[in-house]
Amino acid sequence: MSPQPRKVVHADIKPENPPDLASRYLDVPNMPWEKTKFPGIEIKVLYSDSGITTALFRMAPGAVVPLHEHTALEQTYVLEGTLEDHEGVCGPGQFVWRPAGNQHEAVAPNGAVLLGFFLKPNRFAYGEKFFTEEEAK
């Protein structure tokens, strides 16, 4: 069975976005993994603005994100491996979200690749900074 041709709903409208409103396409597989301040954790920042961050994380087996508090909603989708904390385990294809004020330490016992969405930078127990705009400067 061959795919149906795409139906154009508004063929009479040709949207033209100015450069500041244009879509941004990223070649994620060819982006380099960047080291973080935490051993065994690398990051690809896909979007960041005023604390809002979308990023891929690669965690080596046994890597730990130290104790921290989410200052706003945090969402994580696990692509590979598992992410564990004192509240549960999130495996491949699973999703976890944490409300503002949630505190935890996360570990990837066998390694993991995660897609994370943050509305504001986290507050770490010992003052560490992690994937914040200040680090990028």
Task: Report residues per predicted region.
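Ligand-binding loop in jelly-roll beta-barrel domains
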Residues: 100-127
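Residue-level marker of beta-strand positions
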Residues: 64, 94-95, 113
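Short acidic-glycine-tyrosine-enriched beta hairpin
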Residues: 84-108
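A short, N-terminal "cap"/entry segment at the start of jelly-roll beta-barrel domains
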Residues: 1-51, 131-137
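Glycine- and acidic-residue-biased ligand/ion/polar-headgroup-sensing regions
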Residues: 61, 70-85, 92
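Preference for bulky hydrophobic residues occupying beta-strand positions
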Residues: 57, 77, 116-117
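Conserved short histidine dyad/triad with adjacent acidic residue
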Residues: 36-70, 89, 99-103
